[in-house]
Amino acid sequence: MGPEGDLVAARLARGCRCFAVWMDGQVAGYGWLSTGPEWIGELQLEITPGSAEGYVWNCVTVDAHRRKGIFRSLLIGISEIARRDGLKRLWIGSVAIPAEKAVGSSGFQPALHFTTVTVGGLHAMRMTARDPKLSQDAGRVLRVQPGWYLRRSRRRRH
């Protein structure tokens, strides 16, 4: 089940939903959708989606299926189901260039840009706004505003 297999039951118990793309009888990719607080390890921040909002996270494409549009298909599927279930906005982050291309072509718009580095137990982060209205809303769910941040690095498994 992979390195995070032991976390699946806890995620499902707190209301997270897991989605998968299947090809030839095997999982080609998967991702999670949460409407409650979640830890974003790359940013060292917690996101708390608002009412009728969700957070798409921990999306993975199996190596053998990379560059086949799996991630984009996953995002479109999650978005359609979330909309059907009454969610009005989804938040997602990306730390990889190929993923960023899929995020944009799946209907997501950039709100914030992050530059981060972790060295010697410290986490430095610079956050800049991409869209004034979206960045204000993103700051609300992340409880931060554009600028520089320096904090102790924290590792959390969730």
Residue ranges and their predicted role:
Residues G5-N58:
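Conserved acyl-donor/pantetheine-binding loop and adjacent beta-alpha core of acyl/acetyltransferases
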Residues A82-V95:
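Conserved GNAT acetyl-CoA-binding A-motif
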Residues A96-F114:
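Conserved active-site alpha-helix within GNAT-family acetyltransferase domains
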Residues Q109-R126:
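Conserved catalytic-core motifs of GNAT/GCN5-like acyltransferases
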